[in-house]
Design a protein with these regions (language model features):
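Solvent-exposed alpha-helices and their adjacent loops that cap or buttress functional pockets
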Residues: 10-12, 18-21, 56, 148, ...
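Short Gly/Thr/Asp-enriched flexible loops that form oxyanion-binding sites at enzyme active sites
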Residues: 174-182, 248-250
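Active-site histidine-anchored catalytic micro-motif
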Residues: 147, 181-193, 200-204
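Conserved phosphate- and dinucleotide-binding cores of soluble alpha/beta proteins
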Residues: 196-250
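Active-site pocket-lining segments that scaffold enzyme catalytic pockets across diverse folds
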Residues: 133-170, 174
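Long amphipathic alpha-helical segments
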Residues: 9, 14-126, 130
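Short glycine-rich anion-binding loops that position phosphate/pyrophosphate groups of nucleotides
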Residues: 62, 171-173, 242-245
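Flexible, glycine/proline-enriched loop segments at strand-loop-helix junctions
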Residues: 99-103, 138-144, 163-165, 193-196, ...
Length: 250
């Protein structure tokens, strides 16, 4: 059996601990209170998945697997209906879920469209639609994690052996894969995490992932990055879609 790419990542970056469909329900890690409390929001209707996304139960890249698993749940909900009604139900679910959060609407619409394609394949093959959508969701996770792992491999090669990193917000899988690769290469990174108000993603999520994966991490306030960059010889600054490598000799 092929090793899953989330192996050896921190707890909250493993598939089942982001959003997971099973037995007619979707379970989503509640990042609003993590890591102080490890609790999950359980959804038994696709509209509850959409509401959880709206309510910031999950954020960063979390809404995308949540949307995919929500589509699997929608397929389960309408499984006894005639095929034409199932199609209409899933289309309605895709519309509702994709609009759950305006800032992620375009990408979530693409996710939902991919799950509708999986549903069509399942109908044509006479297979359970919810299982087919869940399988497609896991494939999407695998593909994204492997791409990020490849990027992390090339990125970490450029890190100093004892480098200092400044983060911003919570870069989800990027930070996990980067640290996994750094650990494999024996690089003892020192990490500074701004708190990231108002949800404190840096203090709660990034710092927790770094600590759990065995790295020296310090949480700083949001007005401290310039001071830290001046005093601590920062080699790398990154956030979700941006990275800068600094030359320490300059």
């Amino acid at each position: 059996m092929t090793e899953r790419p989330d192996k050896d990542l921190a707890f909250m970056l493993q598939y089942e601990n982001i959003a997971w469909y099973e037995d007619g329900a979707v379970r989503i890690l509640d990042r609003r209170c993590y890591p102080h409390t490890v609790s999950f929001v359980t959804c038994t209707h696709y509209s509850e998945v959409a509401q959880a996304i709206t309510d910031m139960v999950t954020q960063s890249a979390g809404p995308y697997p949540a949307a995919a698993m929500g589509m699997a749940l929608a397929a389960y909900e309408c499984r006894e209906k005639p095929e034409a009604e199932q199609r209409a139900f899933l289309r309605e679910a895709a519309d509702r879920i994709s609009r759950a959060r305006p800032t992620t609407a375009r990408r979530m619409a693409r996710v939902c469209e991919t799950m509708l394609e999986a549903a069509e394949s399942a109908w044509n093959a006479g297979e359970p639609v919810d299982r087919a959508i869940k399988a497609r969701a896991i494939e999407a996770n695998n593909s994204r994690y492997r791409k990020i792992a490849t990027i992390a491999t090339h990125l970490v090669e450029r890190f100093p052996k004892d480098g200092t990193i400044l983060t911003q917000c919570f870069a989800e899988t990027i930070v996990g894969m980067m640290l996994k690769e750094a650990r494999a290469k024996g690089k003892a990174l020192r990490i500074f995490c701004p708190e990231t108000r108002p949800y404190f993603q840096g203090a709660r999520l990034t710092a927790t992932v770094c600590c759990e994966m065995g790295f020296d991490v310090t949480v700083i306030t949001d007005n401290m990055p310039a001071f830290v960059m001046q005093r601590e010889h920062v080699d790398v600054f990154y956030r979700q879609q941006f990275l800068n490598l600094f030359n320490r000799s300059v």
